[in-house]
A protein has these predicted regions:
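Non-catalytic signal-transmission and effector/linker regions of two-component phosphorelay proteins
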Residues: 1-11
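His-Asp phosphorelay/catalytic-motif detector in bacterial-type signaling
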Residues: 51-53, 78-83
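Active-site residues of response regulator receiver
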Residues: 58, 88
Length: 98
Protein backbone atom coordinates (compact mmCIF):
# COMPACT_ATOMS: atom_id res chain seq x y z
CA UNK A 1 0.00 0.00 0.00
CA UNK A 2 1.48 3.42 -0.91
CA UNK A 3 2.18 5.94 1.85
CA UNK A 4 -0.27 8.75 2.50
CA UNK A 5 0.69 11.65 0.26
CA UNK A 6 3.24 13.91 1.91
CA UNK A 7 3.80 11.78 5.02
CA UNK A 8 6.72 9.42 4.48
CA UNK A 9 7.87 9.39 8.12
CA UNK A 10 5.79 10.04 11.23
CA UNK A 11 7.28 10.09 14.72
CA UNK A 12 5.04 9.31 17.69
CA UNK A 13 6.06 10.20 21.25
CA UNK A 14 3.95 8.24 23.75
CA UNK A 15 5.02 6.71 27.05
CA UNK A 16 2.30 4.04 27.06
CA UNK A 17 3.85 1.09 25.20
CA UNK A 18 0.53 -0.44 24.13
CA UNK A 19 -0.91 2.78 22.70
CA UNK A 20 2.36 3.66 20.97
CA UNK A 21 2.84 0.20 19.46
CA UNK A 22 -0.75 0.00 18.23
CA UNK A 23 -0.61 3.46 16.64
CA UNK A 24 2.73 2.80 14.93
CA UNK A 25 1.39 -0.55 13.69
CA UNK A 26 -1.74 1.12 12.26
CA UNK A 27 0.33 3.78 10.48
CA UNK A 28 2.63 1.16 8.98
CA UNK A 29 -0.37 -0.87 7.77
CA UNK A 30 -1.35 2.24 5.80
CA UNK A 31 2.05 2.30 4.12
CA UNK A 32 3.43 5.10 6.29
CA UNK A 33 6.90 4.78 7.74
CA UNK A 34 6.52 5.39 11.48
CA UNK A 35 8.67 5.25 14.59
CA UNK A 36 7.59 5.41 18.20
CA UNK A 37 9.46 6.84 21.16
CA UNK A 38 8.74 6.51 24.87
CA UNK A 39 10.52 9.67 25.96
CA UNK A 40 11.85 12.99 24.74
CA UNK A 41 15.47 11.87 24.83
CA UNK A 42 14.89 9.09 22.29
CA UNK A 43 12.77 11.40 20.15
CA UNK A 44 15.35 14.20 20.19
CA UNK A 45 18.09 11.79 19.05
CA UNK A 46 15.90 10.52 16.19
CA UNK A 47 15.06 14.05 15.02
CA UNK A 48 18.79 14.84 14.95
CA UNK A 49 19.26 11.90 12.56
CA UNK A 50 16.15 12.49 10.44
CA UNK A 51 13.49 15.20 10.50
CA UNK A 52 10.04 13.58 10.26
CA UNK A 53 7.22 14.66 7.96
CA UNK A 54 4.82 14.85 10.92
CA UNK A 55 4.85 14.32 14.69
CA UNK A 56 2.24 12.88 17.05
CA UNK A 57 2.84 14.01 20.64
CA UNK A 58 1.39 12.85 23.91
CA UNK A 59 0.96 15.80 26.27
CA UNK A 60 1.89 13.91 29.45
CA UNK A 61 5.33 12.29 29.31
CA UNK A 62 7.67 11.10 32.08
CA UNK A 63 10.64 13.36 31.28
CA UNK A 64 8.86 16.46 29.93
CA UNK A 65 5.52 17.33 28.40
CA UNK A 66 4.41 17.43 24.79
CA UNK A 67 3.86 21.18 24.90
CA UNK A 68 7.53 21.77 25.73
CA UNK A 69 8.55 19.46 22.88
CA UNK A 70 6.22 21.31 20.53
CA UNK A 71 7.70 24.69 21.53
CA UNK A 72 11.22 23.33 20.94
CA UNK A 73 10.26 22.00 17.50
CA UNK A 74 8.64 25.32 16.54
CA UNK A 75 11.73 27.27 17.65
CA UNK A 76 14.10 25.20 15.48
CA UNK A 77 14.24 26.25 11.83
CA UNK A 78 14.66 22.61 10.72
CA UNK A 79 11.43 21.48 12.40
CA UNK A 80 9.41 24.71 12.59
CA UNK A 81 7.02 23.71 9.81
CA UNK A 82 6.63 20.02 10.66
CA UNK A 83 2.92 19.33 11.33
CA UNK A 84 2.24 18.33 14.94
CA UNK A 85 -0.83 16.62 16.38
CA UNK A 86 -1.20 16.65 20.15
CA UNK A 87 -2.80 13.62 21.83
CA UNK A 88 -3.81 13.27 25.45
CA UNK A 89 -5.77 11.25 27.95
CA UNK A 90 -6.70 14.48 29.74
CA UNK A 91 -10.41 15.02 29.48
CA UNK A 92 -11.53 17.81 31.80
CA UNK A 93 -13.02 20.94 30.30
CA UNK A 94 -10.07 23.01 31.54
CA UNK A 95 -7.63 20.63 29.82
CA UNK A 96 -9.57 20.90 26.56
CA UNK A 97 -9.47 24.72 26.64
CA UNK A 98 -5.72 24.82 27.27
Amino acid sequence: MPAAKGFNMIYYVEDDDNIRDLTVYALRKQGIEAEGFSCDGEFKAAVARRVPDAVLLDIMLPDTDGLAIMRRLRADRLTATVPIMMLTAKDTELDKVM
